[in-house]
Amino acid sequence: MARSLKKGPFADEHLLKKVEKAIESKSRKPIKTWSRRSTIFPDFVNLTFQVHNGKNFIDVFVTDDMVGHKLGEFAPTRTFGGHGEDKRKKK
């Protein structure tokens, strides 16, 4: 379900402060965040974020196509181990 237009997009304040600081200092250092729920704004383009997936941090380089999506969409939380293998087929 989409967010109401009258509410507007959401991003955590502490993340916006980190982004402003990175833009001012022209730092190429990744911005570490646990805020998977934050929307990607146009200001975030060409910045690298380290998004927490519950276990470790995944590097996410933001491009133009990602604007409007959430940071968490680009850091998968589940790993697929494959389906159970049939023991009878094994030779």
From Swiss-Prot:
Single Gene Ontology MF annotation: structural constituent of ribosome
SUPFAM superfamilies to which the protein is assigned, alphabetical: Ribosomal protein S19
Annotated InterPro entries: Ribosomal_uS19, Ribosomal_uS19_bac-type, Ribosomal_uS19_CS, Ribosomal_uS19_SF
Any one of the GO BP annotations: translation
The keyword Chloroplast is annotated on this UniProt entry: no
Pfam families in UniProt: Ribosomal_S19
Keywords: Ribonucleoprotein, Ribosomal protein, RNA-binding, rRNA-binding
GO cellular component, one term: small ribosomal subunit
PROSITE patterns, per database record: RIBOSOMAL_S19
Role summary: Protein S19 forms a complex with S13 that binds strongly to the 16S ribosomal RNA.
Family per similarity comment: Belongs to the universal ribosomal protein uS19 family.
Protein name: Small ribosomal subunit protein uS19
Organism from which the protein derives: Mycoplasmopsis pulmonis (strain UAB CTIP) (Mycoplasma pulmonis)
Lineage per the UniProt record: Bacteria, Bacillati, Mycoplasmatota, Mycoplasmoidales, Metamycoplasmataceae
